[in-house]
Amino acid sequence: MQERERLGSRLGFIMLSAGCAIGCGNVWKFPWMCGQNGGGSFMLLYILCLLVLGLPVMVMEFAVGRAAQASPIYMYQRLEKPGQRWGLFGVISLIGNIALMAFYTVVTGWILYYFVKFLTGSNADFGFAQMIANPKVNVTYLFVVVVAAFVLLSFNLQGGLERVTKYMMTALLVLMLVLALHSLTFSGAAEGLRFYLVPDFSKINGTVIVAAMNQAFFSLSVGMGGMAIFGSYIGKDRALMGESAHVILLDTFVAVLAGIIIFPACFTYGLEVTAGPSLLFDTMAGVFNHMAGGRWWGTLFFLFMVFAALSTVLGVCENILAMIRELTGWSRPKGCLVCGVGIFLLALTTALGYSVLHFQPFAPGSAWLDFWDFIVSNNVLPLGSLVLALFCCSRLGWGWDRFVAEANTGKGLKLRPWMKPVFQFFVPCAIAFIYVYGMATFAWR
């Protein structure tokens, strides 16, 4: 068995976990989901879902990974009791991570494309619809993203992924603070913040609740083993409740900042906050094109977007790489080559899905991106979280006592006895109910 790699510091662990969580889910998907689902109402439900569902599942995932000292492909097998078959869910984790990269790498390429356009001053001659329909642009930038990710991952854990993520996360936070402060100077800042932060309870319904839960899991990257792999890279000197809280606070801080950057700009320039996936492309690009010094503000904006998206690409690809290496025994370089080629080929479905590989899986206007997102956000993330909750808290799985003993090992915030009903009953029941409701109300056609 290969000796397990280790992260060099607690800061590296928190930054790497937060980097995996912070990404397109926070700075691309969260703002347009918030805009489409009532602004402040969605924000309130999202934060509640983070606290009562996201935090418990993250603690469970860290605990299982650290106890098993394995990637998701084997972590259930190492902790399950003789004769059980929980290990089958490790394969689902691998499928979910690959499906996520089938569209996430393409979206990261879009962001990189916009960054290059603003940096070179050619930001006025392109639009989102034209870009996604251009096969050459999509394939080229997808290739750049995948190659960059797996070249970085080919180095050892501390010298490659951990070091790069620390620098990227620091730069990301600095850039976001600068952009948020600038956005607060807009004439429509007060109106934008009111929409974003003040709940309108009349807009809360079942669809919004399901959207908030799916977004919470998507944003935190829990349910697919992304956090478990980082848990397997750390020692037992810190209790996991506190570590999870740090990651979620950082993740939420970035999501809130993203809205502060975007919504004041939308209300200042009279732009539609319900624009959907194009909100951060056509909408924000339009804002910068009409703003004094807009080229440079746009460059900074899409630079922070690149850092955010690439941090998640690196984290998820590390998870895929770890699982494949455990299955095959390959070295890091060989695993990176094979995984990189495989993800690139699969992601071509999304990259070409608006042109030569057009595919409409659901309602009119849907494409490959929606198909992969449906698999991940609507299925693998909630079902993976449900399986994890049942495994950790049920006598049929690892069991509550073993889970708590692992989670509470080390210094810091610990699980308390009063939390047992929340973890054991509320979390799995809430996830199951919301999942079934979401499937029943999904816009299939």
Question: What would you call each of these model-derived segments?
Answer:
Residues 1-29, 57-62, 66-88, 235-239, ...:
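Membrane-interface "cap" regions at the ends of multi-pass membrane proteins
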Residues 2-3, 7, 162, 166-310, ...:
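Membrane-embedded translocation segments of transport machinery
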Residues 3-5, 32-37, 67-92, 105-160, ...:
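Inter-helical loop and helix-membrane interface segments of multi-pass membrane transporters/permeases
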Residues 6-17, 42-45, 84-98, 141-145, ...:
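Select transmembrane alpha-helical segments in multipass membrane proteins
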Residues 11-49, 225-231, 241-245, 249-252, ...:
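Transmembrane helix-boundary motif of multi-pass solute transporters/channels
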Residues 33-37, 88-97, 144-168, 229-237, ...:
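Membrane-water interface regions at transmembrane-helix termini and the short interhelical loops
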Residues 310-315, 336-354, 370-405:
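Hydrophobic alpha-helical segments of multi-pass membrane transport proteins
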Residues 361-362, 367-392, 412-445:
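A generic transmembrane alpha-helix motif of multi-pass inner-membrane proteins
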